[in-house]
Amino acid sequence: MALSAALRLPLPRLLWGPTGSLLAAAAAASRRRAAVVAVPAVRFLSSSSSSSDGSRSVQPLRAGRDERAAAGEGGAAVKERVVPVELHKEATEAYMAYAMSVLLGRALPDVRDGLKPVHRRILYAMHEMGLASRRPFRKCARVVGEVLGKFHPHGDSAVYETLVRMAQDFSMRYPLVQGHGNFGSIDADPPAAMRYTECRLDVGCFFFLDIDAIFIIGQVDFVPNFDNSQKEPSLLPARVPSLLLNGSSGIAVGMATNIPPHNLGELVDVLSVMIENPEATLQELLECMPGPDFPTGGTIVGNQGILEAYKTGRGRVVMRGKTDIETIDVKSKRSAIIIKEVPYQTNKSTLVERIAELVEEKVLEGISDIRDESDRSGMRVVIELKRGADPAIVLNNLYRHTALQSSFSCNMVAILDGQPKLMGLKEILQAFIDFRCSVIERRARFKLSQALERKHIVEGIVIGLDNLDSVIQIIRGTSNHAMARESLIKEFGLSDKQAEALLDITLRKLTSLERKKFVDEAKSLSEEISKLNELLSNKKLIFQLILQEATDLKNKFATPRRSFIEDSASTEVDDLDIIPNEEMLLILSEKGYVKRMKPNTFNLQNRGTIGKSVGKMRMNDNTSDFIVCQTHDHVLYFSDKGIVYSARAYKIPECTRAATGTPLVQLLSLSDGERITSIVPVNEFGEDQYLVMLTVNGYIKKVPLNAFSAIRTSGIISIQLAPGDELKWVRRCGDDDLVALASQNGMVIVNTCNKLRALGRKTRGVLAMKLKEGDKMASMDIIPATSHNMPETYSRVRDLSPPWLLFIADNGIGKRVPLNAFRQGNFNRVGLQGYKLPPDCSLAAVFVVGFSLTDDGESDEQVVLVSQSGTVNRIKVKDISIRSRSARGVILMRLEHAGKIQSASLISAAEEEEEQDPESASLISEAEEPEKQDPEVSA
């Protein structure tokens, strides 16, 4: 049972224990009872209950039948080497030893010099080989062999990959090795074999890590290498926090580290703040170093993740590639997204392939072509967009679905005092400052001891030179070297070293000039000793020296920041945040093509002109609907089958007037033969708002607007239809609003919306109007409650005040009739005659106008008429005469060969009329002059 319990113990718990420390885990594991195992002679195990506490232990079975026979075959010698040990204890200790070996010896960097052992060994081996920045390159294979043979007894591929990475400018913010040859690329191309590539130390390595000063005895500790044949440094005396300068990453047992690189100039500045004020707040440090600085540049979005990483050691830094928008075709307004920088550790070729795959899968829309034009001058990935595609939307989708936006998960774990520890920014900086103080103190003590020793010798030489004749006489009077040394010591009170140095002086140094040099040297040594003593006794001087050395590096090697930090509250940018909420025109055709254009596409024209074409229409296609909305609006698409779909207005590609539009089947999940008959823009799904729906056969119903706030991509049912009927008109309304209905024969019913009971989506509704044979519904419009004072009974008093009902016949004739000319009538009635039409003519649309008035009390609205051939005319409503219910009306648009009026829409007037472009001017010149007096034909 103990054996199985030990084997079932999870490895992380076995490693760390309930308290989270290695020592606690070892103590907890040692208290467990487990099996006794004999190794390595055990081949089979059996259980017995011979232990005193009744627990079952595992004992070895004898290989033979007789123990004596086994002993006769050498079993006794083997048995002497069998060491009984508890299985759980051996497993725990062995696993902990392995884990700590990986943690301390391979995977994690030291917080003091910021290097892993393999990096440190490579750099030290290259320095021993004399591969300075001004020396010739040497083969990488030779460096790898040197490292493997002397310091790092592991695989050659691991050493070579580390060497290659230290030479890649897209992996290291400040490369430590200069590479000559193929050292890989940002496209993850592998480097050439080590027998082909060459390397040497980079000039920055000597200054950042102060590797030249490593031979100053006592500055850092040296430890034996793996075979005790020589020694290697346990640390390099780094002058700047190399852990933050180039960052680090590694995976160990039970933990990992991932530290981003930073800018040298900012790092020195933040080090200065930390030295001058150890109690500085994190915000003060962020003012000097706002965040990481990645070698590949890009943009860092937001600083919340940076703040968390610097505070706790863990955080998520969101990165984006650097992009530009270029126009590739001015005439067609086609543009392209140019990727100039990618996020750190992003494979460019994989990114390009992924974008192409998403375009094929139709996850990314609006992209027509993608190609990589990168060369030695820099990165350039061109993403060409389709005509009418919004670059901001496409770019936002690229951020959302590809590695063009990725995150760097900071996990700042490093070795501190022989143990792995998660540290924040202040703790890392403080650990480096303490280490650097120790290095400077040890260096100063070493130099002090050398200066004192040299001064002692120089003082003895000066004494000898001052008594040169006596010295010569003593030397000549002795028979050997030892007697001369003893005589000098006895005569002048010299030490052994002083006497030995005096005896070693050559004759040419006995001149007076040489004596002066020794005197000056003694004086210089005295000053140096004084400075070193002062340095060792004053901590502030040590801090000043640390800062001075770091500042020298900043002045010599600092470069501008590559990664731009963009302030943002959220890294998830919604399309609405980047798209301006502008007024737009949506044009829907009968065959299911939709276009989005700016309102100024159609300039104001006079009543009675031909108009301007809405654009190129496909064969046998006509304009079905024409609305005005905002780009942020939800657009509800109602089909003839009573199904409603939803999409934002900006999802429709913006196009020119001459474009044919975008098929709705590319935007909506329409079934075969399904047509969109009405589109309704919604900016907010209010609880007191409703949608009124009207079918061709005259059925009407009211549904709460919020019933359509969540529409799935496949659509939902909006109304139940009888066979042969279809949904045609949908409008927004409130309870107190009026709804005006008109049939093709000109019959009108005006009633309040509160007379309609709110129904669910899956209902048919009630009959709105009794239609005569051959008659169908022609239009529906809503009159806001704040804009009407309509009496409930008919008044014979002629009142021409607004609002008015604007009637538009399909032959291009229209009129305005005061709303007061109608009385409120119930639904399911024949209605009142609103427009008496000739036999070959029918009513095309009815609008309620007069909501926006000028100073003189006239309408400030405009109406856009669209013919079956696609011709559009935009005119002022005030130019349309006010007539009685029985009058024929005036000419609004001369159709000629344009067919009949297909649809009409009201838009708000601009504050200033825009000047007509040459094209519209030519169209107007072809039209007949507007009549000075409106022709009216009485009924």
UniProtKB/Swiss-Prot annotation:
Nucleus keyword on record: yes
Domain of life, per lineage: Eukaryota
Reaction(s) catalysed by this chain's protein: ATP-dependent breakage, passage and rejoining of double-stranded DNA
UniProt function note: A type II topoisomerase that negatively supercoils closed circular double-stranded DNA in an ATP-dependent manner.
Biased composition range(s): Basic and acidic residues: 930-939
Domain Topo IIA-type catalytic: 108-578
A GO cellular-component term linked to this record: nucleus
Active site: residue positions: 196 (o-(5'-phospho-dna)-tyrosine intermediate)
Homology family: Belongs to the type II topoisomerase GyrA/ParC subunit family.
Keyword Kinase in annotation: no
Gene3D superfamilies for the chain: 3.30.1360.40, DNA gyrase/topoisomerase IV, subunit A, C-terminal, Topoisomerase II, domain 5, Topoisomerase, domain 3
Short sequence motif named GyrA-box, residue ranges: 605-611
Database matches in SMART domains: TOP4c (SM00434)
Protein's organism: Oryza sativa subsp. japonica
Alphabetical GO biological process terms: DNA topological change
Biased composition (Low complexity): 46-57
Name of protein: Probable DNA gyrase subunit A, chloroplastic/mitochondrial
Location relative to the cell: Plastid, Chloroplast; Mitochondrion; Nucleus
Chain intervals for the UniProt region annotation (Disordered): 46-73, 906-939
GO molecular function: ATP binding; DNA binding; DNA topoisomerase type II (double strand cut, ATP-hydrolyzing) activity
One Pfam family cited in the UniProt record for this chain: DNA_topoisoIV
EC numbers: 5.6.2.2
InterPro entries with a match to the protein in the record: GyrA (IPR005743), GyrA/parC_rep (IPR006691), Gyrase/topoIV_suA_C (IPR035516), Topo_IIA-like_dom_sf (IPR013760), Topo_IIA_A/C_ab (IPR013758), Topo_IIA_A_a_sf (IPR013757), Topo_IIA_dom_A (IPR002205), Type_II_DNA_Topoisomerases (IPR050220)
